[in-house]
């Protein structure tokens, strides 16, 4: 029966909300109460008219007002919110919001009083938002979710952020009311407001044992608001004093319960999510970052992303804003603590962070380096990419930075397993992908359990960051021989390292067993014998290192000699193995000679054989000149930064490759090659579009997009390092560049070609050079600098990107016509390029269109004419009378030459104007000819157009 009544009441409310008579009466009442405290006769008459025409609805509405058990029922409220009448009502009365706010302010609601966020001025702005259908729909979704039995606050927050970016008036509201909003949030976190008491009122009154209290409020509905406003001194209320004694006692007890239960509505959120109140100081700045905050929040809740990816985006936002950067530099723990709060309060996020060992340790490190948010961003970005080498490199590189106290933190965190977690993260990633590290551990006779023993050296090496970096790098690459050599070299200065090696003799005996397996004498020893002689060997680190180095170079004669020398110095390893070593030395040179012949034969075929990254890098020159044939080979490991251009990998197996970062695939033969399951690694390469055969278009497109992303990342890194002001976000700049790529194919082809030329990390400075830096033109043009510089100059000095790109394109075409390959003509190219940049800047003004000059025919004509002008002013080089080689004297680059260049530009513009006038005249003729002559006129127009474009 109760359910039926609820539905009936719902229908009553919806009918009243939809009634034109009720709306007129309400509108009149709002007008009256906002200007005075009394109701006008007109409003009374309008109300009476509604009552007389809707007596049943009026009766039920009054009855509902006295039945708080119904109107406070979440299901009843949710049912109302799910249907349209209430939202149509809100839209219809949106213009009345400032007046309603004025009425509520008079009634004592602090949120609506002057200088509050929702005062009359604020509501004048917000009323425009509620005329927007999209805003109302989002508001409906938010309201319904809040009324759910188990509210999904992530969903609520996401919808709020969606709503705030839906209408531009919200941003206007933030701009004008940011201080008041900050005050409101501060109050919500620190003060108990009347609205907080009201919530407690309603929550307590829903309890079955509060029926008598509920009856009092239903009989005296106006007492509720008065008590809320005077909860600490109810005796001043006349209506309170007129109650019966028992009622007064009940209410007094009830008010104590309300005060005990009430708390600032934001306090719980601030405490749960470890939000420091200091963050309120930057609320005005954050309110201007709503789109960025939305992206951060969406990332937090996106599958396979979570808290660390969202933290990365948050740090990127901080690093790109001077105010945020300054704030977080002075409040280093706020952002990491918030991230930790999110982890602790979100079970789904906890499962992700536990899986990848992304725990409090990294957040502590990030907290320490927040005085330089760009470094904190790099650390989290590397962590998210799983780039543990770069991550460790970044951490190690700042250990000795006096602005941080990182060393002490790392020592402390290492006791809690920091390095164990890092390396276990590497191992887990390896198991899920290629299992290269696992295989290398097996090759060296070790198990995964030995890894934790390897990590114990890390804290000891904190005093030697470069060595720590090398050791970690060699571990990740599986080069345990090189790692051991580095540690042995450090024993001379640090007895703790020698002690560590002796304490872990079993591991390092396995490594030496693998390393020295081809050395006569030593190769006859088992691991136990190596275990026994390791302390003696460590007493002579230089000699032991010499042995390892000779093995690394495959100098087996030298390795045998070095072993013999080491054996003599240790009295044949303290007398333990004299016969084996002597026998090995006697036969060693014959064996070593055969080994050398085998390894350094003129050519080798690796078909169906495994070739690891170390071998590939060591013999890359032989691979590139064809002496080592990789067709059908099984490639293994991290092959980053390898130039495979012109190499045939036909039928090769790349499924065990873990990285192809910065590899060059220009003219690389991949016919019938088995590619890695994770094709995404190909997007981090160069010249993928020039591989043979052509790979999937979407893969090439992704690789080219990655190139552009890298270029922009590099530009922003330098801009931030120089602390230059950035007027827009990286995301906005990327969008600007994407538009540039889409609107002009010539520019797109040029950008992709240059970014593919070689890895961008080889370009150290993006500023326009003041003087020429290169001997040959090829050094200028075969470089991503041709793209990176225009992007940099756009941000740093507001220079037009397309104009500078056009100047580069034109300079290259002119130089090609004058100098062909351009040997020794780097200075000439530089002078041409600089003059053209200054001229092109003038033609990039709004009235001129660079795209016209970029059209193929115009570009070729312009290049030819300018080249002819320069040729006429050139001189022969010393041998030019024989070879026809020319150069351009510096003195010709003057105002006169500049005017000559401009004349060539103007000629193109004049031709374009003439063509435009001809077309315009012909179009006029088409409009005035009669029907009989229309066909002839169109034929004439087509014929003329053909002549123009010849």
Curated annotation (Swiss-Prot):
InterPro entries, sorted: 5peptide_repeat
UniProt-listed SUPFAM superfamilies: Pentapeptide repeat-like
Protein's recorded name: Uncharacterized protein RP511
